[in-house]
Amino acid sequence: MIRDGNEEMSTIPGFSQIQFEGFCRFIDQGLMEELYKFPKIEDTDQEIEFQLFVETYQLAEPLIKERDAVYESLTYSSELYVPAGLIWKTSRNMQEQTIFIGNIPLMNSLGTSIVNGIYRIVINQILQSPGIYYRSELDHNGTSVYTGTIISDWGGRSELEIDRKARIWARVSRKQKISILVLSSAMGSNLREILDNVCYPEIFLSFPNDKEKKKIGSKENAILEFYQQFACVGGDPVFSESLCKELQKKFFQQRCELGRIGRRNMNRRLNLDIPQNNTFLLPRDILAAADRLIGIKFGMGTLDDMNHLKNKRIRSVADLLQDQFGLALVRLENAVRGTICGAIRHKLIPTPQNLVTSTPLTTTYESFFGLHPLSQVLDRTNPLTQIVHGRKSSYLGPGGLTGRTASFRIRDIHPSHYGRICPIDTSEGINVGLIGSLAIHARIGHWGSLESPFYEISERSKKVRMLYLSPSKDEYYMVAAGNSLSLNKGIQEEQVVPARYRQEFLTIAWEQVHLRSIFPFQYFSIGASLIPFIEHNDANRALMSSNMQRQAVPLSRSEKCIVGTGLERQAALDSGVSAIAEHEGKIIYTDIDKIILSGNGDTLRIPLVMYQRSNKNTCMHQKPQVQRGKCIKKGQILADGAATVGGELALGKNVLVAYMPWEGYNSEDAVLISECLVYRDIYTSFHIRKYEIQTHVTSQGPERITNEIPHLEAHLLRNLDKNGIVMLGSWVETGDILVGKLTPQTSKESSYAPEDRLLRAILGIQVSTSKETCLKLPIGGRGRVIDVRWIQKKGGSNYNPETIRVYISQKREIKVGDKVAGRHGNKGIISKILPRQDMPYLQNGTPVDMVFNPLGVPSRMNVGQIFECSLGLAGGLLDRHYRIAPFDERYEQEASRKLVFSELYEASKQTANPWVFEPEYPGKSRIFDGRTGDPFEQPVIIGKSYIMKLIHQVDDKIHGRSSGHYALVTQQPLRGRAKQGGQRVGEMEVWALEGFGVAHILQEMLTYKSDHIRARQEVLGTTIIGGTIPNPEDTPESFRLLVRELRSLALELNHFLVSEKNFQINRKAA
């Protein structure tokens, strides 16, 4: 793509554009391509023919809105209608109907789909591009073995190999290989055609002996030999049509279909001119590949870099949806074929509508969105998370790599990633380097390659052109790096700049540069582009920061950062959490849940999101930002969403921090905070939890929702209304009943009272009882009920039960154990909340909000936090906000430090506070101990940093158990917080207790508190009475389990117990 115009006018593309454009490409092109492949279907007697007329297919508008689909747990989809005809060949009559094929899930403008009420997203996959690749490996003798690997469109591989005697083999399986002549002959070429189409016929003539010549004497012999080697069949197989079909299905269709992209790559690599619509591997391809392999063997050619992005292709959402649509049509074809045969067999008159069912298409897409590894639940923790999730690229998935087998070379950064895949933003752990994030300006090209924009430097034309180049093209240009550009063009032309050429980094004169970067953020992802002073941070810490920003919780009172990078507004806008005016007009009414706009004679009602739950239990809420009577323009922000302020991303708070040790409470990345952060609700967030229950029709009758629950205390039922559902606005505690439900059941005969048995015997009355199956609030769920939804499916049946959902809001203040982090990888856990009077305070009396450990900076090499901290202090005093692009050293040396010191100096002058900038130790200040009032010995770095509260909160993780459930086999406490489990005392824990000599505590942990059934029952009673706990006199259950397992191995283990009494008696007798 080439754009003319001024370089200052280039804009950042929409962050959700890649997903939405891919879906539009599927609707416009992929849908039609697959429908055209649908064949004409005939019955066995060839009397009836069924076909689709795909030129006039229709996609109906969805019957429900997005909000209703989420509310009722439905799929937001469109119905596909295609005209179909049924032709009777004997009478030449045709019956035509428009039939319903199925539902296709739609995608909104943010790149997400709603399936069964859940937001889902399909991420892009990076695969090896189909074609041929030459590489060299060393065998066990240390000799180079050259191979050419042919990769099909489906991922199947075949290899051409040349040995030390210059003989060429085709490896059709891991163990079997055949001569290249046999393969070419089996594909339809004779020896004369082979020799006429190769550059080295003497090499091809040198190795066939009499036996080989017999094998390639005819096509049938070559096919038999090829089948024998491929299928590993012994004996002498006989040539037949079924043998050819089996070979065609198992080998040629899986390993020889190159596809559109593979044909293009094959033509370019081997200098062929085969038409693009010929997507299968031809004998001509095999011979040209063998010629190139011989040339590479003798030094005339280059090997391929398998990790270069020019040898990769992006499998986007369009390709995945098209593959699933083709699979659904194959299933539909089989169903139609079977229905036609059944109708003819039973002498029925079929119609097009009766032949087609919507089940194949609907179930295929539901299983794809629900089970496919590349279809994931959209992470909606905060607005940044939503847009970053859709820009992920993964090497994993079907046809790709696995986290355990991928090598370090694949995970590593490659020079071709420049401007296409972010070198910083990747996942941590086993998938590091395999799941990346697309760079800001990257886009997916027509051939599935990642393209990046550059400015072309031309002296002939004064206009600046912007080119989008694929990885195979930009390696032929000298590309200047974006961080080497100067504002003064006169100086720029004289300087020597770093550039990239053929995957190498060089230093060249400016006159030799062909292209240059268009933007300093061009090679970073969105997450990395939001880190100020990123050039002063270690890459590992920048990676942690870009990951932790996606874990930030939206706060109740958001605040935009003092020091930013300028992309905060674009990120908030593209996330879709803010309400944007689509038309200009006048605000005639505004409320907490809606805005009414009047313009062009129409009145438009804009509903706002009210306390909506995300799938990470965070609160999504919109706040109106316009007043009644104001005139607005198109594109203006009407309401801020969660974690946005004034249309800018606001994930954290600007707090006053100090880098100093404080009584050891901030060692090992712990953080000391002031109680002001609690009392002033600075880090207070709202979380919404969903609890649901369903009513079924059992064999004993339907379940009932009621507030009359026997055998339960009235205190637990105090919040239920007359229908048995908790009332809105109620405050509920752990154990309270949210929905009262009774399940009918028939009691056993032995459990009846005597009078009940008499009634049954005399009157034949069946006495039924009900079991209480209420929805109870679990541990840690206390809060306020903000919404109750009773969803009744149409035509309710056993398969469509009624669902009741209760939404409870929790207000969480920051507390000890919560995790906080900055934007430079500086993370920590709250260790202590100090009273404000005990916190260190500045020279003007302001107490510090947070105290960080200074030892966390030099070893981690994330010095960017110090620049941000000092510049934030200046911005807070001057009431300024800074937006700084990275790599500002391209303007002058030490530009970041000079900017920070100049702003601190100006703040010191304007506020008449000389302590803000002291020349002896710039950036530091003398501060005082809040407990004693004495100054600390050393000056301390103080400033305002942007600190976020992360989703890892202590309320979700802390757990304690007094009693609970036990495992059936081992009789030991269950494992995990969700099951109210206990903490396991394992082998190493036992060693630790033994090391301290605490024998009685160890015995309690292994007996009373674990699996000694009788002893743990006696402990409770003796504890209440106040007596001594008796020693156990029998074995624990785990020992008995060991004995049983040994018996299952035919080993009898006899054991007996020796008590302390026996020892004491024997001791007295002695």
Curated annotation (Swiss-Prot):
Keywords: Chloroplast, DNA-directed RNA polymerase, Nucleotidyltransferase, Plastid, Transcription, Transferase. Belongs to the RNA polymerase beta chain family. It is found in: Plastid, Chloroplast. GO terms for biological process: DNA-templated transcription. It catalyses: RNA(n) + a ribonucleoside 5'-triphosphate = RNA(n+1) + diphosphate. This is DNA-directed RNA polymerase subunit beta. Its main location: plastid. It comes from the Eukaryota. In plastids the minimal PEP RNA polymerase catalytic core is composed of four subunits: alpha, beta, beta', and beta''. When a (nuclear-encoded) sigma factor is associated with the core the holoenzyme is formed, which can initiate transcription.
